[in-house]
Regions:
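Catalytic subdomain that performs nucleotidyl-dependent activation
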Residues: 57, 115, 138-218
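Alpha-helical structural motif
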Residues: 3, 7, 70, 178, ...
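ATP-dependent adenylation/nucleotidyltransferase module used to activate substrates
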Residues: 1-142, 150, 180-188, 253-254
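Alpha-helix boundary/capping detector
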Residues: 70, 104, 145, 149, ...
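Residue-level detector of flexible, active-site-proximal loop/helix-junction positions
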Residues: 66, 92-94, 161, 177, ...
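The feature marks non-catalytic terminal segments
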Residues: 191-256
Length: 256
């Protein structure tokens, strides 16, 4: 199947299921220069043309200060789409270098928090009521496993959520799409992709989780689809439910 049609079909289903896009929306796409956000912009561009919904789209690229990440080609690629991409300069990397972890590496969680704050502020400054991120199905499953392994909880990110402090709604229209289909779509459209300049690139906990899951998929091919179905099957959740539901008591019981 044509990867563009496949990804766009996932996009439309996500919008139908979670009512992500409405008339009058002004949506800011968090642009990274990678395949996910670029394909998301393309899907929004097509959706605006062929759906009956009236909405505006802009792109926002938060420059973290890593350097060597050239976004100009990506901006130029989308110029015919009539979707402006704004660059927000920050000193986030300088801040991260002051808070290195025990292994002298930058902290991914702090980076994500600072980047999100810069993105939200920029989106509001440009009059946007929604922010669209390029997270896909594989990201959702990886997040689920990271939370289970490191946090002892069944949780992943939501396809749509209100950021209460800012009043901005965050949406993830590619949440049903698989990463390999997005990669095929980017290749077919010959999208210029900006290399990730993060010093931790390829050596993160998320990358380790991705590698573990890919190994699992080789041994159990059906698990990939089943994991996605699991995240949507909220009516069939069977976990322990102690009659004493005191939070502190629960934490004590799960301690080794």
């Amino acid at each position: 199947m044509n990867p563009i049609k496949k990804v766009l079909g996932c996009f439309r289903k996500a919008d139908n299921d979670y009512h992500m896009i409405e008339d009058g929306d002004r949506i800011a796409v968090g642009v990274s220069g990678g395949k996910d956000s670029s394909c998301l912009i393309h899907c929004l561009h097509l959706y605006k043309k062929f759906s009956k919904k009236n909405f505006d789209v802009i792109g926002i690229y938060v420059d973290l200060g890593f350097g060597q990440q050239h976004i100009d080609e990506v901006i130029e690629y989308f110029r015919p789409y009539d979707i402006p991409i704004y660059v927000v300069e920050t000193q986030i990397y300088d801040i991260l270098k002051l808070h290195l972890d025990k292994e002298d590496r930058i902290e991914c969680s702090l980076c994500a928090k600072l980047r999100k704050g810069a993105l939200v502020n920029a989106a509001k400054a440009h009059g946007c009521n929604k922010i669209a991120l390029g997270h896909h199905s594989d990201d959702a499953v990886e997040t689920l496993f990271m939370n289970m392994i490191n946090g002892g909880r069944l949780a992943t990110f939501k396809p749509k959520m209100l950021l209460e402090r800012s009043g901005v709604i965050m949406i993830r229209p590619l949440v049903y799409a698989y990463e390999h289909d997005i990669s095929r779509m980017a290749d077919k459209l010959e999208m210029p992709l900006s290399k990730n300049a993060c010093p931790n690139s390829g050596h993160t906990e998320r990358q380790a989780m991705k590698d573990m899951l890919n190994s699992l998929y080789k041994d159990y091919p059906s698990s990939k689809n089943n994991f996605q179905l699991m995240l949507r099957n909220h009516k069939q959740v069977d976990i322990f439910q102690p009659e004493n539901d005191d939070e502190e008591d629960i934490q004590e019981r799960i301690m080794p």
